[in-house]
Structures are given as structure tokens and as C-alpha cells.
Amino acid sequence: SMPFAQHHYPFENKETFEKQFPAQFISEAVDQTRGWFYSLLAISTLLFNKAPYENVIVLGLVQDENGQKMSKSKGNAVDPFDALQTYGADAIRWYFYTSSAPWLPSRFAGKTVVEGQRKFMGTLWNTYAFFVLYANIDNFDATKYSLEYDKLAVMDKWLLSRLESTVKAVDDNLANYRIPEAAKALQSFVDDMSNWYVRRSRERFWAKGMEQDKINAYMTLYTALVTVAKAAAPMIPFMTEDIYQNLVKSIDASAPESIHLCDFPEVHENWIDPKMEEDMADLLEIVVMGRAARNTANIKNRQPIGTMYVKSEFQLSEFYKEIIKDELNIKEVVFKDDIADFISYSFKPQMRTVGPKYGKLLNKIKATLSELDGNKAMAELKSTGELKLDIDGQEIVLLEEDLLIDMAQMEGYVSESDHTITVVLDTNLTPELIEEGFVRELVSKIQTMRKEAGFEVMDKIRVYAKDNDKIVSIMKNHGDEIKSEVLAEEIVTGETKGYEKEWNINSEKVTMAVERI
């Protein structure tokens, strides 16, 4: 059999055979359980009284999108060469890594391949393209700088901590043949890198000159891109090779010829900060809930809000509060132990669980629950995990699963809650907040017009506005802020030149134009 015959063992190459036996792993489809896995095991046990392999990866069969076995006669077979031509090898590989555990059947569907390609590969490529765009504008060469960890901003240190934790997780999962877990760790990191780090750091790349903070941002993102490319190289070999050739080989002739000749990244344990990662994860959860509360209140993110109250089991430092305020466009974030001033709770019994437990007492339990001080009852439930009632001298103990809990919001406030966090938005808007919302909308509309007019990222422009006294007044009052945001040298009112467009901004109609200088 192959492990023995390939080296003509036992007639020669005894030392070579012993170095390679047993194999670290063997991989075949499930239909080879008897024909291959068992045959090898039987022969090896007979000859050596030991298994010929240390690990087995059994691959499930590939089915069509409806879970049916592929068959030419049924017409549901997919030509692999057509699929490769349509989606690319990397996208198909990534689909198989993430769709299910290797030993389970895989339902192959083009739309699923495209979705995986968009969520991971597209996000990674867009982040890489962002870096390349601004690196070319600034003639940035990573070989001329070093990553000075002690000089980095908190966001930089957080990204590097996430990076090293990810590399560690990928290495551990691959070493233990947990392929989907390794792929999902990479996908989670790339999502954080693109949709949080880059989005929060854009203005650092836009800054003039090459100050230390801008260098730090470049070097942090460069390090993350190169490292994640190396970690993902075994899974998406072609895209990562492109990234490596442009980011590394093009500026360092001494680097290995290919990313596949590089060592797998080593983990920098001293960069890993679990507390920082936990705090940022808590922050992100608050931001997600804050956005949901805004949607419930039907208030766009460009409209500033006065205050958000947060009730949670943790506290965040002022640094993280500032990020929340900026991300949610909120003036103040207040952590509170009690939010009874803004919301109230009411309780009903969950018939499915309370009925079998207490039967005839069900109606009395329902009546007692309706008379409770909802906020005190919720506090008891959260602190002890149960709610105790006294009904006809009998102690009734209800768990959270026994209760239907309704949260009512006070007028002028909107809340979102999960098991550990509640956020409450004060939706009362002052005239000053409303005017600031107009400014945000104006900046957004001007940026849209820049793109539609085909202006380059760094082009200076002149902005025009007419036909609405309120909008014109706001643009005059906040001219410096607007000009700074849209790279404008001047705001002209009462006339228009260049690319012109009519807008309806918060029910105010205005004509605006942009002109390249």
C-alpha cells in the first residue's frame, strides 16, 4: 500500500520511511472510508500494530443547492471549470472553508459563493485598495519606517491586538484541523479592520504632510494587511499573492519571491491586550444598539442627539465614550445604574411554563404580576435570576423563562436592550441640534456631488448655494466647518456654477453646485 510501497520499503529507504511514518493526517471523501482509510489502517495494524496516520479529515460530498446528489442525468451537475471561470479559485476555496465542517455535505450554489466572496475577499481587497490609494498619493514606502509600538494610538494598538489574537486563533485551529473556525476568525478580523479601524482612522490618512500619527496609521494598516495576507495565504492563495507582490516584493527585493515561501506569521504576545479588545467589543455592542434605537426613533445618524444613557455591567473610560459620541453623533454618554426614569417594565406569566408548574394559581399569578412595581421587579430578576411572589401564603418562584416582559418607553425617549446592556436615547431635539443636523446633511450632499462630478479625492473645490434663505444662512454660519469637511476653498451664495443639483434637505429645497478650482 502507498505509505510503504512509495519508498520500496522494507527493501530500502528504511530511515526515510521511519521519519515519515505515521503520517500527520490523511484526507479523502467519505466514500473512501472503507476503500482507503480502512485499508491503510488494516495493513498498518497487521505490519506494525499501529495506525498509519495521526489524524483523519473526512470530506463530505458536494451536493446541489437543494441538497441533492449531483448527477449529469439529472442535469444538476456543476462543471468545475465553468465555476472556476465564473467565480475564481479563491472564492470557491473560501466557500468550502466556511460553508460547513469538512465532513458534512456541502450545498454548492453560486449565490452563496458570491456572498462569501463579497463579505471576506471583497472587504479585504477594498481595505488593501484604500491603503494603496493613499500610499500612492503620499509616496509612502514602508521600508523607510518602522512600527514604533509605544508611539501608537489606542486604535492602532487595538487593531494589532486583534491581529495577533487572530493569527493565534488561526494557527491553533489549523493545527487542530478546525478549518471553518480558522476561516471565520480571519473573516471577523477583516471585518473589524475595514468597518471599524479604517473607518475610524480615515482622517489620519487624509492629513497633510507625513506627521508621526499618519506614519503610525500607515504602518499599523500595512502590518495588518501583510500579516493577514500571510495567515490567509493557504486558503486564498491567489489574492494574497497579489497583495504580497504589491505591498512587500515591489519595495523589498530581498523578500521571498512568493508569499507561499514566507513563514506563517509569528504571534507577538506582547501586542495582545485582552482588556482592550473586551472594551472595544463592549463599545461596538453599545454602538450597534444605539444605531438600532436611532432607527426606532426614525432619526438619521447625521442629526445630532443630546444624550444617550447606558445601563450595563461594565464601565468604559472617557476615551471609549468619545468614540461612542462621535460614532452615534451624540453630545453626551452617561452610564447609569438605574434607568427607571426613562423606561418601565410590566410582566405577564408565560403560560407554557407557568401553567404546568402552578395550575390553579395561574390567574392569581397573572393578577399579582400586573400590580408589581415593574422596575423593582426587573431589578430583583436581574440581581437574583428569579422573581418571588407570595400568593395565598405560598411562595411562587418565577424564572426569566417563566415571564413575558414588556418594556415601555417614556415619551421623548427610545431604548434598546439585551440581557446585559440597555441604551436610552433622549430624542428631544433643541434648535441648535437641528441646525447642526442641517450642516451634516449639507456636507453629505456636497461630498455626493464631488463624486458625481468626477472630482479626484484631493481636488479643491468651490461650493455654491441659492434659492433657500435658511440653508444659505446655515452655510454662512458654519462655513469654516463645511469647507474643511469637503476640501472647499470658498462658499458662494446667490448663484451657481459648475456641476449643479437640486436637493430636498429636511424638507428644505435648495440648489447647490460644485466647481473644481
PLM-predicted stretches and their roles:
Residues 1-2, 47-85, 104, 113-517:
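Feature 926 captures the class I aminoacyl-tRNA synthetase adenylation module centered on the KMSKS loop
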Residues 1-106:
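Alpha-helical recognition segments enriched in aromatics with Gly/Pro capping
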